[in-house]
């Protein structure tokens, strides 16, 4: 299994995990540099302190063997002054100065790469957020259309034509809003679907670049630690065993092993996010309620006379429940009906007409929904909106 950044951080918080490691690396570099700077300062200060001590005791006068011993003590201290001064200077000039420059330069480079990764991460999150919002809007309008369609179905049994017309107008508006919201939702899904391959390539490239900067950091610190051991070895006597152990552990620093260790312990997922899918409204579509108008119950049964129909609407009384639907009756002789009220169909299967229009009756149904012809249009219409002529 690959243990590269670009193959293991596709899961949730993948970018955040890499970002955290990059920031940890920056902080570690700062602390490595701080240690070396302080070690150099301590060595220099120790050298100066010894020098000051030697100066303050320079008036000590002895004779014979005690004088010889004193000279030996001073000589050892003077040797340490030189050793610690040289070690401090080597660490400061050969390690700290270039290390400080590397730290500043890599911090800027990583900041730019991390910002690129942040933008890519935010870009996708913004697109996903747009999909979530447009889907919620689409579902909301679709649900409203579904509810109003049910209301209109019931209203055709209980309400006046004018009241039904208002409900119908509201339904048509909500359906238009739902259609617009659906298109926005589809556009959001398509936008991310089309961009996804490009986005994946950019993310892979960016993560690989971030890994290279981490490898560079590990390699550079390894070199500086080797120089540090070399400085100690060349200036401090009697440290051969310590130096040998330190050299061995520093030599074993392996950038790839360290990268793989981080990946194994922190990976968020190897599967790239699937492309988004358009999900249709989960409820029953409003079109399910208006697709087959012959199955609707008309406000009044076809057996009610035109006078009763007119009286019923004028008094706004509750209408009786229609009889169950029966098999349509084919007319041997075409009949006509005159529209008593304006009617706007809820879709293309219904006839629109105005009061006074003459409709040729093609089929009658006991449910109250007739099929008729008006001009060059044929469709379903509620028979209780008309009177036979």
Curated annotation (Swiss-Prot):
Keyword terms: Coiled coil, SH3 domain
Domain F-BAR: 3-258
GO molecular function: microtubule binding
Stretches for region Disordered: 300-329
A Pfam family this chain is assigned to: SH3_9
Cellular component GO terms, alphabetical: cytoplasm; perinuclear region of cytoplasm; vesicle
Record-linked InterPro entries: AH/BAR_dom_sf, F_BAR, FCH_dom, SH3-like_dom_sf, SH3_domain
Ranges for domain SH3: 332-389
Coiled-coil residues: 119-192
A single BP term in Gene Ontology: chemotaxis to cAMP
Low complexity composition-biased segments: 300-328
PANTHER family per UniProt: PROLINE-SERINE-THREONINE PHOSPHATASE INTERACTING PROTEIN 1, SH3 AND F-BAR DOMAIN-CONTAINING PROTEIN DDB_G0274695
Designated name of the protein: SH3 and F-BAR domain-containing protein DDB_G0274695
